[in-house]
Amino acid sequence: MDYYSEIKQELINNEVYKKVKDYSKNKSDLTTYYNVGKLLVEAQGGEERAKYGEGIIREYSKKLMMELDKKYSYRNLMSMRKYYLIFRNEKVHAMRS
């Protein structure tokens, strides 16, 4: 038995697994950001520059930070909204499934 080869293969398999896992997580995050951004734009009446909509996002942010996690700040929700606006006409939305 070639122990070195066995050990090396185990380590390679682990690295491949981690990369696949990271890709899946990243894809899931991007899909979530796209979908949240879309919902935020829809909540603002579909307007790209809805002034009153900033209040909606601030309100949602406060609630989400209290109920879920601090990472859902106004700034992060605005970034998700911008992400959607940038990619809404691209094939990125095909990732939603």
Residue ranges and their predicted role:
Residues 1-97:
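Basic, low-complexity intrinsically disordered segments
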